[in-house]
């Protein structure tokens, strides 16, 4: 026991300190200070002579060893060392899982960062032949940025850093908090002292909550088991003498224990430390449960206060590509920012509506031209000379014997002929001396 080194276990427990809650850090302090230090320092000096000073009032060879085995089937110090190792095992296993998960997440983040590029993808510039003499040089014309890219870029997270490189731990923490976390956690941590010292939210963001609770339950079960075993083996005090009747002792002999009072006090201290660790485990489980319940209540209140969100924007491709005359190569998509895509979609809708109005106006103008009566000014020239012996037309001369209604209709036709058409592409040619107006 004098050469026992606790440095390895202490380093492991200090690493667990970085992935535990506030109550878990208190438990770790109690474990390191009151258990490891007391067992390594106090137990070494108190129990160093427990077998050498255990004497019996007989000279029978082997009787002392048999009686000491009956008095202490397992040494107090060895029992407590075994208890520390077993109780620390769930925490060490949790640490191994946490380190593996975080290392895997950082590796995935590094690969994702390597796939990111500082700008849009540029196609390799083709090697063009030199221009003929007299032509301008094409080397200063720049490179055309493509508008097409593979769809594998769509799975990249929005808001990612532009250049390649690995993010720091603080940036990844803020990133996950802004997205709503990873794993089982849904809470968003605000920057500040409260967010920095709350290990529960960090465990939720890292997706380690279930494993952390499982190791708490196992640790509490081990504490209860060792408390029961310590009571069954040693009771609550170390007696000053022990009556032994085992073979090869010739009769019932009395054996005497060295420093029984000091060992009794130390035994009671270890009982208190074990109960304190068990209480801290229960408090930590209650802290995790109440904290998760509070986060759920706050999330519901925030959702009810915010009210229903805005209606989702329709997809950019609201019209089929075949109807719009668009065709894209397979596995390709337009590289457009989210804001620009929405603005372009609205502009396309406005352009389509304006084009529909123009088409409707053109169709209405064509139908109006088909349904309009012929011009009255062309009657005299288009009909030709009157037939021989036929009656003169009511509108052919000023001295015709037509009725008043016919004269009114002829006047209306003349006004309609002289009025310009709506939507015609060319103007009209007319004369100021009263000649007929001809539309082209």
Swiss-Prot record:
Residues 108-199, 368-440 are annotated as: Disordered. The chain crosses the membrane at residues 22-42, 79-99, 224-244, 265-285. Mainly expressed by oligodendrocytes in the central nervous system. Expressed in optic nerve (at protein level). It is a multi-pass membrane protein. Its main location: membrane. Keywords: Cell junction, Cell membrane, Gap junction, Membrane, Phosphoprotein, Transmembrane, Transmembrane helix. The modification Phosphoserine is found at residue 372. One of its GO terms (molecular function) is gap junction channel activity. Pfam families: Connexin (PF00029). Residues 150-173 have a biased composition (Acidic residues). It comes from the Eukaryota. Residues 380-401 have a biased composition (Low complexity). InterPro entries: Connexin (IPR000500), Connexin_CCC (IPR019570), Connexin_CS (IPR017990), Connexin_N (IPR013092), Connexin_N_sf (IPR038359). Residues 1-21, 100-223, 286-440 are cytoplasmic. Gene3D superfamilies: Gap junction channel protein cysteine-rich domain. Belongs to the connexin family. Gamma-type subfamily. One gap junction consists of a cluster of closely packed pairs of transmembrane channels, the connexons, through which materials of low MW diffuse from one cell to a neighboring cell. May play a role in myelination in central and peripheral nervous systems. A connexon is composed of a hexamer of connexins. Interacts with TJP1. This is Gap junction gamma-2 protein. It comes from Rattus norvegicus (Rat).
């Amino acid at each position: 026991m004098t050469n026992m080194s606790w440095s390895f276990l202490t380093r492991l427990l200090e690493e667990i300190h970085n992935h535990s809650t506030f109550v878990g850090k208190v438990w770790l302090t109690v474990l390191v200070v009151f258990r490891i230090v007391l067992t390594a320092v106090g137990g070494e000096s108190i129990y160093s002579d427990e077998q050498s000073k255990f004497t019996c009032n007989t000279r029978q060879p082997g009787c002392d060893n048999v009686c000491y085995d009956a008095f202490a089937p397992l040494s107090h110090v060895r029992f407590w060392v075994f208890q520390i190792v077993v109780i620390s095992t769930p925490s060490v296993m949790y640490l191994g899982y946490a380190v593996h998960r975080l290392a895997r997440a950082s590796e995935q983040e590094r690969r994702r960062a390597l796939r990111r590029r500082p700008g849009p993808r540029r196609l390799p510039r083709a090697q063009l032949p030199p221009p003929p003499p007299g032509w301008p040089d094409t080397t200063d014309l720049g490179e055309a940025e493509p508008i097409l890219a593979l769809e594998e870029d769509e799975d990249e997270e929005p808001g990612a850093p532009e250049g390649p490189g690995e993010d720091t731990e603080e940036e990844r923490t803020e990133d996950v908090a802004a997205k709503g976390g990873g794993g089982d956690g849904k809470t968003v941590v605000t920057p500040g002292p409260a967010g920095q010292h709350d290990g529960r939210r960090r465990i939720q963001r890292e997706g380690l909550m279930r494993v952390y609770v499982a190791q708490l339950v196992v640790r509490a079960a081990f504490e209860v088991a060792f408390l029961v075993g310590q009571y069954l083996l040693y009771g609550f005090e170390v007696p000053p003498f022990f009556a032994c009747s085992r073979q090869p002792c010739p009769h019932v002999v009395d054996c005497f224990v060295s420093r029984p009072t000091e060992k009794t006090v130390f035994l009671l201290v270890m009982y208190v430390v074990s109960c304190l660790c068990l209480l801290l485990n229960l408090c930590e489980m209650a802290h995790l449960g109440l904290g998760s319940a509070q986060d759920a209540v706050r999330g519901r209140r925030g959702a009810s206060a915010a009210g229903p969100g805005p209606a989702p924007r329709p997809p950019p491709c609201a019209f089929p590509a075949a109807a719009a005359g668009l065709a894209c190569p397979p596995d390709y998509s337009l590289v457009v920012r989210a804001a620009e895509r929405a603005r372009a979609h609205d502009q396309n809708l406005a352009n389509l509506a304006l084009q529909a109005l123009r088409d409707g106006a053109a169709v209405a103008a064509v139908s109006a031209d088909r349904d309009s009566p012929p011009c009255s000014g062309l009657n005299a020239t288009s009909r030709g000379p009157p037939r021989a012996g036929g009656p003169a037309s009511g509108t052919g001369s000023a001295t015709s014997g037509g009725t008043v209604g016919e004269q009114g209709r002829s006047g209306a036709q003349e006004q309609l002929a002289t009025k310009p058409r709506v939507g015609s592409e060319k103007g009209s040619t007319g004369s100021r001396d009263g000649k007929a107006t001809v539309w082209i």
